[in-house]
Regions:
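ATP-binding N-terminal substructure of ATP-dependent carboxylate-amine bond-forming enzymes
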Residues: 6-103, 107-108, 112
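Structural detector of well-ordered beta-strand residues that form the stable sheet scaffold
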Residues: 37, 76, 97-98, 125, ...
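Short, hinge-like loop/turn segments at secondary-structure boundaries
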Residues: 53-57, 93-95, 115-118, 145, ...
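Structural motif corresponding to alpha-helix initiation and N-cap regions
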Residues: 58-62, 84, 133, 165, ...
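A conserved helix-loop-beta module that forms one wall/lid of the active-site cleft
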Residues: 99-158, 165
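Internal nucleotide-binding/catalytic subdomain
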Residues: 158-247
Length: 247
């Protein structure tokens, strides 16, 4: 009796970004037969010492992203501020990209996000698009509001609370969203997974507790304490957001 064992080559998986989330991705990837690659500007980033191969480079730079990805089987991200143009070309050349570049274009741009919500009737605060400070200065009647720069803002950057016209000096002289301020009882984050077949999975929602001076996350409470009917609403909205994206 002879048995034949065939070993398939390990899949080469790239991650754009080497921060804490990239490190957690690598910890999960350790359970699978994959070879991991990370692209990040900092040699001492949290993910640098857990991946099989580390490349120093700017995840927003076309050449850096394209050259990093052209020998890989699949690429994913730990942050949305990446060069989507390079990912589109890599996808056309056969590299699997998760999430798809077409989805990333919306995810990384708050203006496109708001228009996406509006198109698909997903609940969201009222908003106005401002292309520069001159346009922002005409919106005193819309206050109080939150000004969010269209692209590039994260971890407290690119967000300003505007209560009076004098606060317009803190606004952004770039394409941005001016979002009507709402009273927040709790801020909830809901993770959803979707595969090509359209199947979805929901993870327990978490409550986000922010430092309101720095607009930075202080703590997450998991699972969030929610009434059942509120949980159903959270899940329904999250599923609507994900299902309207084309796989």
């Amino acid at each position: 009796y002879t048995s034949l064992i065939i070993f398939a080559p390990m899949q080469k998986i790239g991650i754009l970004g080497g921060g804490q989330l990239g490190r957690m991705l690598l910890q999960a990837a350790a359970n699978y037969p994959v070879e991991t690659f990370v692209l990040e500007n900092d040699n001492e980033c949290p993910a640098a010492h857990l991946c099989h191969h580390f490349t120093r480079g700017d995840i927003k730079d076309f050449d850096a992203v394209y050259n990093f990805g052209k020998g890989l089987d699949a690429i994913t991200i730990e942050i949305e501020n990446v060069n989507v143009d390079a990912l589109e070309i890599l996808e056309a050349e056969g590299v699997k990209i998760f999430p798809k570049p077409s989805v990333l274009k919306t995810i990384k741009n708050k203006i496109l996000q708001k228009q996406y919500y509006e198109l698909h009737q997903i609940p969201s605060p009222k908003f106005i698009i401002t292309n520069n400070l001159a346009e922002l200065n005409k919106q005193e009647e819309f206050l109080p509001a939150v000004h969010k720069v269209g692209e590039g803002g994260y971890d407290g950057k690119g967000v300003q609370l505007l209560k009076t016209k004098e606060d317009f000096l803190k606004g952004f002289d770039a394409p941005s969203v001016l979002e009507k301020m709402v009273n927040i009882h709790k801020e909830i984050a809901q993770m959803v997974n979707k595969i090509k077949k359209g199947e979805t999975a929901l993870y327990p929602p978490v409550e986000m507790l922010f430092n309101h001076q720095l607009n930075l996350l202080d703590f997450q409470l998991c699972p969030a304490e929610l009434e059942q009917k509120t949980l159903w609403k959270v899940e329904a909205i999250a599923l609507a957001v994900v299902r309207n994206f084309k796989s």
